[in-house]
């Protein structure tokens, strides 16, 4: 009989811990859902909260059409298999010694996808690089940009001043910052941040980023097909 309390006490403690954990997790998800719903209302997108195999709510997601473009806001942990084809295209663009689509290999991340036709198959990526040149603009000192073959011709128009400002806003005095990648690959512009969407400030930044990415996609789609011969060799997903 003396051993019964020794068994019940740890079990009760574990049960209490699990209750607290799931309540807090549920509260965090509800907070995220509210932020996603605010973005959904702003851009007339559909908000959803998929469930995992165990029946628990996972990441909230947004999807729909905005400015005649398919737009998605999603999240993942470590990697999202839905990005697999874009990861392959990114490896072609960056090369064997270049960065990967996700520089931070572990932890949560949130990303925006804005679809585009990209008739000339332009491709580029923007990556944080604090070892940039001493001269030049502030953007040049903090970020490294690489274009596919011939992409530099229109790069200045695609990576608009609004996009540059938003990326600079993610840079702080701290080494840790949310920005991971901005890239054009095949049929989509992708913006990736480390972590989950947790604050109204983040939601506002994502809202500005969606509009800026749509502006950039308009430029990409206005690029005529005759430039295909000097554009990136990176191809769109089937």
Segment roles from a protein language model:
Residues 1-10:
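Feature marks short, highly hydrophobic, charge-poor N-terminal signal-anchor/signal peptide-like helices
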């Amino acid at each position: 009989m003396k051993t019964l309390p020794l068994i019940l006490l740890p079990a009760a403690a574990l049960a209490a811990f699990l209750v607290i954990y799931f309540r807090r997790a549920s509260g965090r998800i509800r907070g995220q859902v509210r932020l996603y719903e605010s973005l959904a209302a702003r851009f007339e997108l559909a908000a959803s909260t998929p469930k995992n195999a165990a029946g628990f709510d996972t990441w909230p997601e947004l999807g729909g059409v905005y400015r005649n473009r398919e737009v998605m806001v999603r999240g993942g942990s470590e990697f999202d298999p839905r990005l697999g084809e874009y990861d392959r295209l990114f490896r072609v663009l960056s090369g064997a010694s270049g960065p990967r689509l996700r520089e931070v290999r572990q932890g949560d991340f949130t990303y925006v996808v804005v679809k585009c036709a990209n008739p000339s198959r332009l491709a580029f990526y923007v990556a944080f690089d604090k070892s940039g040149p001493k001269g030049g603009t502030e953007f040049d000192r903090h970020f490294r940009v690489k274009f596919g073959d011939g992409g530099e011709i229109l790069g200045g128009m695609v990576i608009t001043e609004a996009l540059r400002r938003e990326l600079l806003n993610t840079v702080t005095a701290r080494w840790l910052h949310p920005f991971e990648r901005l890239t054009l690959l095949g049929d989509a512009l992708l913006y990736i941040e480390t972590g989950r969407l947790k604050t109204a400030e983040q939601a506002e930044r994502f809202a500005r980023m969606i509009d800026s990415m749509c502006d950039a996609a308009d430029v990409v789609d206005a690029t005529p097909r005759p430039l295909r011969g000097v554009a990136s060799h990176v191809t769109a997903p089937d």
